[in-house]
């Protein structure tokens, strides 16, 4: 097959750039950026990268914390494979020029919810930005890597039962074209923009996951949508809610309700350091009992210099955008969609059920996160799986996936139950608000069945897309329906999925 490149990567986040830099320099590599090279969800990551680094920690402890957070649904073999590469991943990032914070005896490690010890390597509270800046410098030094900006991947091209490239939309001209490749990699992030309130940037419209579904790839665990407990309860900017890092609670931040009472000890023995799903549901429960739509996160009992040193971007944002000085005042917070725990089914090397197609980062479901992601495991997964993927591609290793049976689109026969309530008019804000209500932290059978019926109707009535926005809407609908169906099929309350009728 004549190809335009050896490896075609749709996405420009941490996993995508790590893969490109880890492949042999003899490979012809193309990176498709939906917007600019430096515009990606990875850049907004605050917390850090979890790895068993210190003398008081070890891989077994990290594995145990990950399995507990994942609520029994992690793939333990994948967990061990990925976490065992934590220290080499940090060392690789150091070699790329990432200047992690230091203490007197080495890396400065912080602690976050669900972790039993300090193991989070970080750069203040803007780790993602620092990491991405370093990798972009390295990318621009590689003549074998071509970067195409403002290019949107639309669909997977196949030949003889294997992926052979992508159909792409040039967002500058709205023209489509094909790129053929020996290896195709989807690394376009999650589906956060199906919700009205999300920490993800506007580009996270589930493009890669939707493409994979249309191509018949195996996907799994899409019901497990992680809601971060502490999004800033102020107006969002550019469709993205500002995140208040897990590390604020890790460094002693206290959650209080409208009455000024600390409430987390009533919900979990780990209090503010419980896993994200537990803290998010607890905050939602407290908000339901009070008149204000937020709770307070207070770190002001720590020395002001400590707060400014550890959380400079949070301090700066709250002061400039909200007039809040977090060294003296509590931060108003509420849960916000943050991460897609499921995705395209892969092994730890990123290999999917479709030959020559790979998926990495939040797009993929390796089994590491199970029903709920442990804080700061996602950036680690990006680096480790991308490096393993590079090795698999270079070595020509094949992955024999289990046969995949696409779930039937059940409940379509019941759509008539809600016929009086369904809306024919579709818009992105309407979809996002609808999903926030029915596919949010707290779900129920009636809401999920109504969601499936409504989403199927919108999907059936959708016109053929021609513009970038229309293609994004197609993907948002595809992903929304997949989440709703997965949530309805899950008859157990576990991790990030909670159905009051189960």
Curated annotation (Swiss-Prot):
Pfam families: FAD_binding_2
UniProt-listed InterPro entries: FAD-dep_OxRdtase_2_FAD-bd, FAD/NAD-bd_sf, Fum_R/Succ_DH_flav-like_C_sf, NadB, Succ_DH/fumarate_Rdtase_cat_sf
Taxonomy, superkingdom: Bacteria
GO cellular component, one term: cytoplasm
Matches recorded under SUPFAM superfamilies: FAD/NAD(P)-binding domain, Succinate dehydrogenase/fumarate reductase flavoprotein C-terminal domain, Succinate dehydrogenase/fumarate reductase flavoprotein, catalytic domain
Binding note for cofactor: Binds 1 FAD per subunit.
Recorded metabolic or biological pathway in which this protein acts: Cofactor biosynthesis; NAD(+) biosynthesis; iminoaspartate from L-aspartate (oxidase route): step 1/1
Name recorded for this polypeptide: L-aspartate oxidase
Catalytic reaction list: L-aspartate + O2 = iminosuccinate + H2O2
Principal EC category: oxidoreductase
EC number, as in UniProt: 1.4.3.16
GO molecular function: L-aspartate oxidase activity; nucleotide binding
Positions contributing to FAD binding: 12-15, 34, 41-48, 207, 362, 378-379
Subcellular location: Cytoplasm
Site positions (Important in orienting the L-aspartate substrate): 112
Biological processes annotated in GO: 'de novo' NAD biosynthetic process from L-aspartate
Major site of localization recorded for this protein: cytoplasm
Record-stated family: Belongs to the FAD-dependent oxidoreductase 2 family. NadB subfamily.
Keyword NADP: no
CC cofactor: FAD
Keywords attached to this entry: Cytoplasm, FAD, Flavoprotein, Nucleotide-binding, Oxidoreductase, Pyridine nucleotide biosynthesis
Known role: Catalyzes the oxidation of L-aspartate to iminoaspartate, the first step in the de novo biosynthesis of NAD(+).
Active site: 276
């Amino acid at each position: 097959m004549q190809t335009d490149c050896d490896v075609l990567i749709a996405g420009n986040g941490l996993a995508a750039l790590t893969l490109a830099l880890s492949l042999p320099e003899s490979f012809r590599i193309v990176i498709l950026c939906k917007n600019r090279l430096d515009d990606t969800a990875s850049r907004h990551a605050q917390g850090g990268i979890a790895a068993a680094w210190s003398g008081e920690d070890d891989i077994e402890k990290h594995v145990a914390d990950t399995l507990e957070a994942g609520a029994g649904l992690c793939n333990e073999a994948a967990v061990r494979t990925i976490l065992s590469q934590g220290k080499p991943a940090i060392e690789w990032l150091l070699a790329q020029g990432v200047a992690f914070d230091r203490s007197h005896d080495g890396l400065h490690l912080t602690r976050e919810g669900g972790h039993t010890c300090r193991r989070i390597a970080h750069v203040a509270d803007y780790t993602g930005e620092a990491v991405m800046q370093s990798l972009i410098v390295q990318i621009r030094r590689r003549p074998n890597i071509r970067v195409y900006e403002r290019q949107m991947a639309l669909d997977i091209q196949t030949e003889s039962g294997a992926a052979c490239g992508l159909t792409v939309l040039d967002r500058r001209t709205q023209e489509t074209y094909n790129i053929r490749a020996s290896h195709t990699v989807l690394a376009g992030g999650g589906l956060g923009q199906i919700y009205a309130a999300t920490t993800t940037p506007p580009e996270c419209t589930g493009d890669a996951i939707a493409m994979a579904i249309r191509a018949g790839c195996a996907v799994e665990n899409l019901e497990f949508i992680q809601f971060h407990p502490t999004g800033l309860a102020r107006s969002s900017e550019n469709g993205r809610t500002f995140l208040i890092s897990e590390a604020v609670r890790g460094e002693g931040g206290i959650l209080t309700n409208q009455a000024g009472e600390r409430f987390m000890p009533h919900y979990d023995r780990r209090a503010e350091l419980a896993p994200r799903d537990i803290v998010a549901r607890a905050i939602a429960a407290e908000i339901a009992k009070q008149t204000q739509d937020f709770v307070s996160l207070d770190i002001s009992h720590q020395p002001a210099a400590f707060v400014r040193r550890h959380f400079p971007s949070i301090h700066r944002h709250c002061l400039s955008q909200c007039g809040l000085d977090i060294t003296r005042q509590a931060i108003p917070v509420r849960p916000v969609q943050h991460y897609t725990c499921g995705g395209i089914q892969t092994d730890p090397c990123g290999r999917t059920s479709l030959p020559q197609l790979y998926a990495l980062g939040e797009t993929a479901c390796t089994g590491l996160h199970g029903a709920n992601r442990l804080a700061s495991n996602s950036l680690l997964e990006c680096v480790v799986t991308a490096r393993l993927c590079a090795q698999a591609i270079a070595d020509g290793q094949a992955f024999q996936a289990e046969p995949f049976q696409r779930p039937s689109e059940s409940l379509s026969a019941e759509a008539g139950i809600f016929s009086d309530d369904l809306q024919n008019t579709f818009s992105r804000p309407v979809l996002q608000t609808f999903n926030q209500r029915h596919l949010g932290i707290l779900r129920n059978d009636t809401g999920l069945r109504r969601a499936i019926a409504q989403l199927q109707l919108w999907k059936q009535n959708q016109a053929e897309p021609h513009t970038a926005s229309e293609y994004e809407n197609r993907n948002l609908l595809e992903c929304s329906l997949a989440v709703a169906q997965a949530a309805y099929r899950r008859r157990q309350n576990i991790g990030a999925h909670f159905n009051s009728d189960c």
